[in-house]
């Protein structure tokens, strides 16, 4: 029976090559799109969920008041972890992870690498599933003299030699023994490091750094099986307040399920409420709709050809075929077609996956060696085939043989309404996606064009390691005298990142709530404003060479002045409730963007050397050659900091990263909008071909009676264009509602303009007209005499 159905299905598909090709192409593109989206979704939802006891693993967070609301941050202090491990019996294991202070120069002989490392507690490998290729995970980090390397770093340092037991030099100071080689980290993890050092080594470097007010690491806890997170949160909430002086700290600790940390990162009033999970939901819907559109193509074309297949059904029923056997045959046809499309889809995915990975910024792969992949893929394809063929199978098998064979059965008119509905559904989704794409791209451009407050072109920076800090003046002199740079300044952090913030500041006229205001904190030297091209609005910039009191001088940005309600800020005195130097305001600088360009600028204090300098900023001279001067800069750094590579970064590129997520969304939505249009047009092309074929006698008569090619083309096109018009009317409010909700998350946002809908409508009409006109012109230009004779 199966063999007979297969043979009949294959024969039917080969007999109608055009419709089979259209169906296979549409389903293949739809399946490929769905597979790509599913790969991305699987990567997102599995992010850091592969660790043991993930349901009991939590990341500790702080919740504090700021500017009248609650905000959340996850950097915690060093003594927090040991205190929790000691005093909270419901906690099974505590692990600290410090990714900010372990960036050393790792050397083996003449091989030097300034790369990203992390300090971790001894039990790191018992909490996180990062397998060691060599070494014992229980003992690899139990000594201050140990180091664990990733496989990639081990190969860079030792080539093909076994790294285990060998020593590497850390910052030209200490020798560490390699006690583990770690399999390179997967793409679906938040952890980023090339080597791990034990906290015992950190304690050796910084023996007295146990300040409960200084948070710069992540603290993870694994609760015991019977412990509840609600009870733990209640007990741990005030631990920071209990270990600090009265009034010194206001932040409360709570535990966030780590399995949700990647997907739920947005905060509203102190609670995690959303984040990338919204993208997962959105692209899940897009995948479903794209597949649905491909299935609609199959349904429309199958039912459109019902008149031609009616006699086949009638004869088979007269010959004794049961309706159930006809249903099985028609569904078999759709499954066979889906299998062929599935093979094409796998090929499309394989060809496009590298480009797709670039767009989404991931390392997605298909594990062909996994038998479950093939099982799921086959089920997915078969279900798609069944879904696509179910309605046509039941409809075609319902024909009454007497009416069919007598010629009184006219199925086309009966099917017009459902077919129209399906076409409207297709184009509604496609038009909505196009509108969303235009608005997302507009929002990204709006943020990109927002005044950053400083000039980014030709501006670069190098983070100071090794001898760079000691030799800063020599490096600065070398950069300027060689002509490599036109200006040089040192700062505590890059202009695109926040490395320090704090509250507890009081000033004349401030109140209790003001002390909870969080300020971004930044150290800069006297060349800062000229190097960055900042605009000083009041007072002057920091110049502690000519003004000795500027060692405690502070520049405020406009946001800080507004938050502090200062009418005449220059000369105002600012004190910290926690002690430290008394600051005096020497100037006001125009707001400049450090954090998100989509969000309001936060209050900021810029001081002299109080927080220390960690970054050299320099503006590269364009004359006579940008590239030549960059090489000169490299020589200067190599001369005065020879042990460290010249790891230069550029502010225009660093700033562009801030738009990556929104640009990625816009690109993906645009890509799938184009694919949706393509699939819809395939179906429209097939329907137009069938309609032209079914009305061939009418067209011939009209041509003989004098109808022009334009008249015939308009006759065949107007019905489809009317459907596209209905789709536009339905899609526009849907797209407006979706985009209005999306834009509401951005304080700085565009308005949704009428022209977006007008352009989309014209584009949709043009695409539909071009698709239908191909078949309409072909029918109109055909010889009417030959068509009438054949009839």
Question: Could you describe each region identified by the protein language model?
Answer:
Residues 1-6, 10-11, 15, 19, ...:
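Membrane-helix entry/capping segments
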Residues 16, 294-336, 683-721, 775, ...:
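Interfacial "coupling" helices/loops that link adjacent transmembrane helices in transporter permeases
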Residues 42-63, 89, 131, 189-191, ...:
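Membrane-proximal juxtamembrane linkers immediately C-terminal to transmembrane helices
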Residues 44, 58-116, 123, 155-160, ...:
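Hydrophobic, regular-secondary-structure patches
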